Amino acid sequence: MLYLRRISGNSMLPTLHNGDYIVALRRIFTTYKCNEIIIVKHTQYGEIIKRIAHIDANNQYWLSGDGCDSLSSQAMGAIPKDKVLGALLWHIASQWLSIIK
């Protein structure tokens, strides 16, 4: 399944900017790897887009943002695979969208 999401906020700067779009792909048979950017359905924070910082012994994901405005890994907690919606496939910078208009 493909997901299209608009970036809201600055927690993934400088990689992803507020207003950018990403397309993510859900993986069924393969796992996600450290440093991949994923979309997660978090029980407390809703849908969040973060980078996998660590995979623990229980195969749960610990996330971090690229920017200083991000929640800490400890605040987000360990994320099980069934909460992952998908991994970044394409990044569409908002500056390109303004050129197209």
Give the predicted meaning of each segment:
Residues M1-K101:
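Extended hydrophobic leader/signal-anchor segments used for secretion and membrane insertion
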